[in-house]
Structures are given as C-alpha cells and as structure tokens.
A protein has these predicted regions:
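Accessory interdomain/linker segments of ATP-dependent helicases and helicase-like nucleic-acid enzymes
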Residues: 35-87
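Beta-strand/loop-dominated core regions that host nucleotide or nucleotide-derived cofactor-binding catalytic loops
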Residues: 9-12, 19-23, 27, 64-158
C-alpha cells in the first residue's frame, strides 16, 4: 500500500489493516469494527470500495465515478518552525490558511511521517487564542516530536 501516496494515506490504511488482522486473530472482529475501519479508510484517497475480483467483477465495474472519493481533504496551513521537547509544543508559521481551535490537523514530514491531532490549544505571543491568523507564528501542543519544515495541514470535509 502507499505507492505514490502521502504519509496520511499510508498511516490510515496500514493502521486499519493491522487492527483488522489483529481482531480476526484474537476473535474480536465485529461488523461494527469493520464499519469504523471503512469510515476511517474513506477519509483518505480511494475510488470507492468493492469486493474485488473474487466476486467475478471486472476492472471498470467497481466504481461509477472517476477520481478520488475521500471524505476529507488536506488544506495547507504552513510549516513547523521549532519543536520544544520539554513542553511537547510546536511553533508553526501560519502561511497559507488560518485554522481554529478544535479543528483536526495533520503534520507530515520525511522523518515525522503522519501525525494526526486536534487543535486543542493555540497560543499567539504566549496568549491563548481561538483562531490562528495568516502571517502569525503560533504554538500548539503536539503528541510527539516534529521537525522544522514539516508541513501543517487542516483536514476538512470534502
């Protein structure tokens, strides 16, 4: 999986597949879990889901639409400037788009991979704010190490 796809795609697909395999092996597989995995998988690049060639379908029969059917899309916000390891906080430059408290974010980078988080807190000049404006440098708590020049995106409903 993941040929020519972003780190968020690889992270989501591999996580879902791993959880599915583990649940089959430990006997905890349910239709509810399958539905949750399908929902998560639908957030990243896909052309719809089908039963595959095992059900006798041929190429071209598996989707009615052309292109990506992901339910979420990435919107570039900016980049990481610095990571403060003792605080678990990243300083980010808000360059392309704004974001608000509570939005779903994604940080990607060559070493970072894909890090999903919610904007639970935003600080501008040490003060809490509800919205990060273009041109600002803000700090946000992050769950793990990020690196300078990692890209920051918000995930919005497609």
């Amino acid at each position: 999986e993941g040929r020519a796809r972003g780190p968020e795609y690889v992270h989501t697909v591999v996580s879902c597949y791993k959880e599915a395999i583990e649940s089959v092996l430990d006997g905890s597989f349910t239709e509810e879990k399958k539905d949750k995995w399908d929902e998560r998988l639908s957030t990243v690049f896909n052309r719809g889901f089908w039963d595959g060639y095992y059900q006798g379908q041929k190429m071209g029969e598996w989707t009615k639409d052309y292109g990506n059917k992901a339910t979420e899309k990435k919107v570039l916000i900016g980049k990481v400037i610095k990571y403060f390891s003792r605080l678990g906080v990243a300083e980010v430059a808000v360059e392309a788009n704004t974001f608000v408290k509570g939005e779903k974010l994604l940080i990607t980078g060559n070493s970072t991979g894909a890090m999903f988080l919610n904007a639970e807190e935003i600080r501008y000049e040490l003060n809490p704010v509800d919205k990060a404006e273009q041109g600002w440098r803000v700090s946000i708590p992050v769950p793990d190490k990020v690196r300078p020049n990692d890209k920051l995106f918000k995930l919005v409903v497609n």
